[in-house]
Each structure stands twice: as C-alpha cells, then as structure tokens.
Amino acid sequence: MSLEAIKYKKGRLEILNQLLLPHESTYEVVSDTEDGWKAIREMKVRGAPAIAIVGALSLAAEIYSKPFASSEELAEFVKQKLQYLNTARPTAVNMTNAVIELTAFVADLTKCSPKDMKQKLLSKIEGMLSEDIAQNKAIGKFGAESILGAVGGPVRMLTHCNTGSLATAGYGTGLGVIRSIHEMKQLEHVYCTETRPYNQGSRLTAYELVYEKIPSTLIADSAVSMAMKTKKISAVVVGADRIACNGDTANKIGTYQLALAAKHHEIPFYVAAPVTSIDFSLVNGDAIVIEERSPLELTSVKGIPVAASGIGVWNPAFDVTPAGLITGIVTEHGTFSPQEMKDKLLALKG
C-alpha cells in the first residue's frame, strides 16, 4: 500500500508535512488558500502534480462553507485565489494548467446559482484526486512496458528526487514506473540519489522505498556516473515539473547532469509525467522560469551552519534537460520520443 500524502473529505484538507520526513509523520490541516500557498512555498508539499492538487483543494476547503451573494462574486473570488496560488512556485506548470482549467470552468457556470456553481466546482476539484491516481497508474504501466521492452528484465533502475506518492495524489510518476516494474516482479534493484540540497531522495524517495519494501540503495548525487559504470544500471527514470513542446524538460536540479552521464554510458533516460506537465505554449526550454531558493538551504542544516561564512551561493531548484538527451517521455497516453510527443498528444486532444 502506497503512502497517502493528501487527505480530503467534505471541505477538510490535510497534508503530510514532508519537511518532517522521514523522522516524523505529521498531517497538517490546510484551511484556506493562504495555508495552501504557504504549504507549497515552504515545500511542506512538493512535486508538480501534488502542488496543483493541494492548491486546488485549498480553494475547495476555503469556499466549502463560505457564502456568496452571486455567481459573479464566486467566479471573481475563485479567479483571484487561483492566481495567488500560482505565485507560490513558478516552475511547475501543473498549477498553471489547473488555474486555466478551473477559471474557465467557473466562467462557463455564471448562469448557475451561487450554490450550484459552488457544488459543481467542488465536484470538479475533488475529482482531481482520483483522476491523478488513475493517470499515474497508466504512466506506471506504459513506462514499465517501454523500459522492459527496450532493455529486457529484470532491471536495475536509477531515479532522482521524489516522484512517488509523496509528489502526487498517489502511486507516482517516475517512482510509479519503478513501482509497476516491481509489481511485475521484474525489478532487481533501484538506486535513488540523495538529491541535494533539499534531500528529497534521501528523505522522501528512500522513505517510500523502505515503506514498500522495494530493494533499493541510496547514493550521493556525485556518485551517479560511478553507479552507471559499475552497478549495471538498465535505465534512468525521472519526473518533470515542466516540459516544452520539443521535449526539453525542467526537473529537479541535477537531472541535466544525470542525463549527460546516461548518454555517455548508453543508458536509456526516461521522463515520466502527466500531460498536465507539458507546456504547449513553449517551443523549447529556454523560456522556462527557473526558481532560485534561499542560500540557507545550501549553507545550513536545521539552522546549523555547514559552510564558510561569507561565501556566495547560487541555489537554482531546477535545471532543463535538452530533449536530445531523453529517450522517451512517458505520459498517461503512452510513451513518446521528444520529437513525436507534441503532434501525437495534440492529435489525441482532437
């Protein structure tokens, strides 16, 4: 059974505070969009799909018992709150897509009564949870089939950051692929990176792997090339925060160098993400906004300094992996090469 990072029922939203993992499993109540914004910004919840879901559900929690005099008032309230949520972390596109989708949804309901509009909006948002899990299971299935079809099995996998149940509504994207391979009894071993400086790999991915008893080993970020050379890695799978039309992919810092190392060692490199992570407005990855975070994330651990005082710090949270380094992009609709992804997915959308 996978971890449950997001709990929602009848206007009550709780999230597993990922800042406290792996030492403490504590759920915190998110009462409104201000709580939601802070949870996203402070990385109590992280992972592009989870950011969008928690953002939307924080809106649901806020409007659940709040009265509105008119449907126009509700629509304007929703629009402003969604725009605010979208400022919490700019690189992940899933929240932007949720903002566009939900804003358009309420705009089409202005002829409804405020009560009916609210109920339809709540149903729409609440459906995002089950929809995300279904998408993740499809991603897991297609990714497992693609990797096993390409390299055979059993396989030894390498992954970066956290792309499992803690980064989504459940099951996961990149880790969902690994989970699917494990369920098929074709996983020999998985190596996960520590993922400095926030240690999502050592704190979160390792936590999930141990929780589910998946054979696994934690390695330093700087050990990936050595692991590829000596540990017989079959394939690499990572997640994505934003994918451009040509396949350029923004993901957790360190992904780019991982892809370069995989290319050198002739190891297939896969990106696993729902279609909501694809930004069809971007021709390539050059225009992706890269979030830069506090220097303290590099210079201290739990408030204790670990770097020389006065040293300059550059702390980008993401990098962009060029499409030419990516073997395939796994979505809920199948696995596509970066070159074919845009046309095939747009054809599916009709």
UniProtKB/Swiss-Prot annotation:
InterPro entries in the record: IF-2B-related, IF-M1Pi, IF_2B-like_C, Initiation_fac_2B_a/b/d, M1Pi_N, NagB/RpiA_transferase-like
Catalyzed reactions: 5-(methylsulfanyl)-alpha-D-ribose 1-phosphate = 5-(methylsulfanyl)-D-ribulose 1-phosphate
Keyword vocabulary terms for this entry: Amino-acid biosynthesis, Cytoplasm, Isomerase, Methionine biosynthesis, Nucleus
Cellular localisation: Cytoplasm; Nucleus
Positions bearing the site annotation: Transition state stabilizer: 161
EC number in record: 5.3.1.23
Pfam families linked to this entry: IF-2B (PF01008)
Pathway: Amino-acid biosynthesis; L-methionine biosynthesis via salvage pathway; L-methionine from S-methyl-5-thio-alpha-D-ribose 1-phosphate: step 1/6
Primary site of residence: cytoplasm
GO biological process entries: L-methionine salvage from methylthioadenosine
Active site: 241 (proton donor)
Enzyme class: isomerase
GO molecular function terms listed in the Swiss-Prot or TrEMBL record: S-methyl-5-thioribose-1-phosphate isomerase activity
GO CC field: cytoplasm; nucleus
Superkingdom of the source species: Eukaryota
Listed PANTHER family: METHYLTHIORIBOSE-1-PHOSPHATE ISOMERASE
Similarity section: Belongs to the eIF-2B alpha/beta/delta subunits family. MtnA subfamily.
Task performed by this protein: Catalyzes the interconversion of methylthioribose-1-phosphate (MTR-1-P) into methylthioribulose-1-phosphate (MTRu-1-P).
HAMAP family: Salvage_MtnA (MF_01678)
Protein name from the UniProt record: Methylthioribose-1-phosphate isomerase
